[in-house]
Design a protein with these regions (language model features):
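N-terminal cap/lid segment of alpha/beta-hydrolase-fold proteins
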Residues: 1-29, 78
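Conserved alpha/beta-hydrolase "acid-adjacent" motif
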Residues: 166, 192-198
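C-terminal catalytic histidine-bearing segment of alpha/beta-hydrolase fold enzymes
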Residues: 200-203, 207-259
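Short beta-strand element of the alpha/beta-hydrolase
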Residues: 31-41
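Short beta-strand/loop motif that positions the catalytic acidic residue
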Residues: 184-187
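Surface-exposed, glycine/proline- and aromatic-rich loop segments on solvent-exposed faces
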Residues: 262, 268-344
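Primarily recognizes the serine-hydrolase "nucleophile elbow" in alpha/beta-hydrolase
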Residues: 87-178
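Catalytic nucleophile-loop/oxyanion-hole region of alpha/beta-hydrolase
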Residues: 47-49, 69-103, 229-233
Length: 345
């Protein structure tokens, strides 16, 4: 890609090549996932000292392989940074075996301000099998580019407008991406850049298409990085970790944990159900005589639990944790394959 307009104010040189700085866990068999970290600084600089390296270290301590993405910045364009993000995701997938990386069922990204925009620009425009030629007609695709660029979870912090401008007509995430990642969003209530109202626009544009969680922190402005001491923003990284566990189905509130199934249920199966609340991965359990049923899944951004008694396959709901699922319970149970029950482990 030919780049011009390098000046004394340019942050990157003409020969800048983006790269990843790895923070790998010792035991790759125990790796929880792979977290790409993108520091802020708009599209003109990289604030790695506050929003890059400390974040990667924190996620590494929690059991993730973490990587600080050194994306191209000014005078490179915002589209160039999105391409760098896309390449980073594909690089990890392509090289996972040769590098011996674990946790490849979860590729996530955390970004701050312009780093947030880098993530969202990739999610909106360079997802899945979309090729870099979308923005660079001269780009020569290689084997790495045949990998999916989809992310599983994203944590965009205080920077939802990914086109580089904070405008009053911001409409959120405009995309045809059919596989939106789960979104953990966070912003300070005193953020003067416009990120505070924008984050709700972003959240609302993604609701019903993926799992979305939003946190706003009191007495916190723009650029809090790992958290501003003396405020609850210092908890965002462990909260993001819990969120990832939730959506990946491995935490206490996750879907598919055999330990969650109450005593008395002996057969279980998992399947996908799509209803008025969207698409959900359901864990459904019954007893041997099929006289009672237990179902758990995520809907309306929270864990749902429904229990009931069965009479010839007809459910009478006896417990509905949220109070919203009783009317859907029969349809959810009917979606189970009655020939595919497995013993509860």
């Amino acid at each position: 890609m030919e780049v011009s307009d390098f000046t004394a104010e340019s942050y990157d040189n003409a020969d800048m090549k983006p790269f990843l700085v790895p923070y790998l866990v010792e035991d790759q068999l125990a790796a929880k996932g792979n977290m790409i970290v993108i520091a802020g600084g708009g599209y003109s600089s990289r604030g790695n000292a506050m929003e890059g390296y400390p974040i990667a270290e924190a996620f590494q301590d929690l059991g993730y392989n973490a990587y600080v993405l050194q994306r191209r910045v000014a005078p490179y364009s915002q589209e160039d940074t999105w391409l760098d993000m896309q390449r980073a995701v594909r690089y990890l997938r392509y090289n996972a075996d040769s590098l011996g990386l674990g946790g490849m069922d979860c590729i996530a990204a955390s970004g701050f301000s312009g780093g947030s925009g880098t993530i969202l620009g990739e999610v909106a425009n360079l997802y899945g099998n979309v090729q870099p030629t979308l923005y660079d007609a001269d780009y020569a695709s290689d084997a790495v580019d045949q990998m999916s660029a989809d992310l599983d979870v994203v944590c965009p912090l205080y920077g939802p407008q990914y086109d580089g401008e904070h405008t009053s007509d911001y409409a959120g995430l405009i995309t045809e991406n059919p596989n939106l990642p789960a979104m953990f969003l966070a912003v300070g209530e005193n953020d003067a850049t416009g990120a505070m109202p924008d984050i709700w626009t972003l959240a609302n544009s993604a609701r019903g298409k993926t799992v979305v969680e939003v946190h706003t922190f009191a007495e916190v402005g723009h650029g809090f990085g790992a958290g501003l001491q003396g405020t609850t923003s210092t908890y965002w990284i462990p909260m993001a970790d819990t969120f990832i566990d939730l959506v990946m189905g491995r935490g206490e509130a996750g879907v598919g944990e055999a330990a969650e199934i109450p005593e008395g249920y002996t057969q279980v199966q998992q399947y996908t159900f799509e209803g008025g609340f969207g698409k959900a991965d359901v864990t459904c359990a019954v007893d041997d005589a099929k006289t009672k049923v237990y179902m758990t899944f995520v809907a309306f951004d929270q864990q749902q639990v429904v229990e009931g008694v069965l009479n010839d396959g007809i459910i009478t709901v006896t417990y509905d944790q949220s109070g919203f699922m009783t009317n859907d319970a029969q349809a959810i149970y009917n979606a189970a394959d009655q020939n595919n029950w497995q013993p509860v482990a």
